[in-house]
Amino acid sequence: MAFADLTTDYKGAKSAIFRLALATGIRTVITAGFYRFWMKTRMRRYYWSAIRPGGMPLEYVGRPTEKLLGFLTAVVFLAFYIGIVNLILMFFSYSLFDGNAPAYAVSVIGITPLIFFAQYRARRYVLARTRWRGIRFGLEPGVAGYVWRALLHWGLTLVTAGLYWPVKTYYLEKYRTDRTFYGDARMHQGGSWKMLIKPMMHLYLSVALLGGTGVLLAATEDPRYAPLIFLAVPWFFYGLAAWKAGSFRELTNTKTLGEARLKSSARNGRIVGIYAGGWAAMGGIFIAAAIGVSILFGIIFAATGFAVENIDEDGYLTTLGNLPAFVPILFGIITYFAIFIFWGVLKEVFITLPVAQHFAETTEIANPQALLGIRQRARDEFAEAEGFADALPLGDAF
């Protein structure tokens, strides 16, 4: 008997993620970043539990203490690398080239493999701590192969000024997916890199228009070409959203798990709307908050004797009226951290959650009866967790 395709429900709510992100963000700031490992764990558990293929939620069972210990381990290693290796590079740089620029260049190149190393290890940890229907996901060891492939594909992407991007995206995703397991079943990434050309076309064309406009303006000094910039820039941002939706859709539609396969109907227009509406809402909220704070402090300054006469000929304040001198400093600190916290909170509410919801609700599992024979896999202890990703830092991505 054939089963119907499994659809995915999404049970997340903006109000709940706002409260969670705000509470954990404040605690992270108060603890000077120490709470971030607990914040990440709680946020991830919320998102995972909201995604429910076939009505059954994903589970995230990672622990914050794992992340903390992994971070400390990574910091010790990176401190050695940055301290000792860079010292050696600086010595040879001054000895051979009479300057420090070569040392900085080699140092950046030297740390690049660690970034790819951290990305693969972080993905392995997240999958090892994710379960669905009680069965664990997993990623088999293969970090060395991923690092050299990432270096090769990213190098070709830079050499081709971004034209190679779809090829890079496909082959790196294929490497990761082909080593991903659900229980004892291996996933497979089908298709080819050619299927990603179409989602990339808006970016190709908008960048070509922007670059061509710049060349025309420089060569002719004719301002009549300038309006093309106002076409190219919005088109570029549309292309970014279209690439996110299109690449997810094409890659998902060619993923299989044994006889089961994934299907996605993610829509470009919906992702564009989420980003446009989300950034507009965030900008409007911050502008309104800035106006409100300005009015409030105008009232406070007026009540405490501040006047235009307190500003000298160079534009500096000579007195704050009856306000203590530490008040502006305290206000600046509070404002900085308030912006830091609320930017992250609003981004979760208006961008991250709606995008996750759309991708989840447009994803289905075809031929789900093939999943019935899948058995549990052994637990991957993986003591270092996401330490290198947090330390570099690459740990903000889900």
Regions found by a protein language model. Name each.
Residues 2-17, 21-185, 200:
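Transmembrane-helix bundle segments that line or gate the permeation/cavity pathway
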Residues 47-61, 127-144, 174-196, 248-272, ...:
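Juxtamembrane inter-helical linkers in multi-pass membrane proteins
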Residues 77-91, 158-172, 204-220, 279-302, ...:
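Alpha-helical transmembrane segments and their membrane-interface junctions
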Residues 82-111, 210-237, 289-344:
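Membrane-helix interface segments in multi-pass membrane proteins
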Residues 250-286, 297, 306, 317-326, ...:
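Cytosolic/matrix-facing juxtamembrane and C-terminal tails of multi-pass cellular membrane proteins
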